[in-house]
Amino acid sequence: MASNTLIESTSLRRSPAEHLAEAMAQGSTAGAVVLREIAFATQVGVRAVPGSAGHAALAAALGTGLPQQVGEVAGAAEGTAVLWLGPDEFLAIAPEGSGLAGELVAALGGEPGQVIDLSANRSVLELSGPAAPLVLRKSCPADLHPRAFGVNRAIATTLANIPVLLWRTGEQSWYVLPRVFFTEHTVHWLIDAMTEFASPTVA
């Protein structure tokens, strides 16, 4: 009798922007603005009604709690973070290889709610450097001033006429999360918008 063997391997994986890595590196300027991909980040969609047993169980399992209002992020980019998408909808982001989805499913148990692995749904691009907000302002309609958009806040907005999640992860760093099929468009737009910052300083 023939037998089937399942071999798990990460060597054949390709991230959404892997083929654009060289272009991103060439378009970046150290000390001004740098673009790179955060490949294979774990992304888990979570839904639970605030105040419910399921909501409490998920908040505890995440270790960060769940954000309570628009723009709020629980946790931080260095570990597990949870972005507010709606009153009962959240996106948890964790490092590559995290078993977060399984942990949350187990925590939810039979309580009403939803946990879905969305790791292949969006790419994660990091734009960093003092010129990063200037690049984003060329096409993002959101108010990016620090008074309105502080560190560790995230919103749904548009960039280059496509919907993205925009998360300010640090004083000079931002995560841009487009749907996977918009990754190439987003990367090329960002590289083009970064071009002026690669020009030599005019004396």
Curated annotation (Swiss-Prot):
GO terms for molecular function: sarcosine oxidase activity. It catalyses: sarcosine + (6S)-5,6,7,8-tetrahydrofolate + O2 = (6R)-5,10-methylene-5,6,7,8-tetrahydrofolate + glycine + H2O2; sarcosine + O2 + H2O = formaldehyde + glycine + H2O2. It is found in: Cytoplasm. The keyword Chaperone does not apply. Its main location: cytoplasm. One of its GO terms (biological process) is sarcosine catabolic process. GO terms for cellular component: cytoplasm. It comes from the Bacteria. Pfam families: SoxG. Keywords: Cytoplasm, Oxidoreductase. The keyword Metal-binding does not apply. Its EC number is 1.5.3.24. Belongs to the SoxG family. In the presence of tetrahydrofolate, catalyzes the oxidative demethylation of sarcosine to yield glycine, 5,10-methylenetetrahydrofolate and hydrogen peroxide. In the absence of tetrahydrofolate, catalyzes the oxidative demethylation of sarcosine to yield glycine, formaldehyde and hydrogen peroxide. Heterotetramer composed of subunits alpha (SoxA), beta (SoxB), gamma (SoxG) and delta (SoxD). This is Sarcosine oxidase subunit gamma. It comes from Arthrobacter sp.
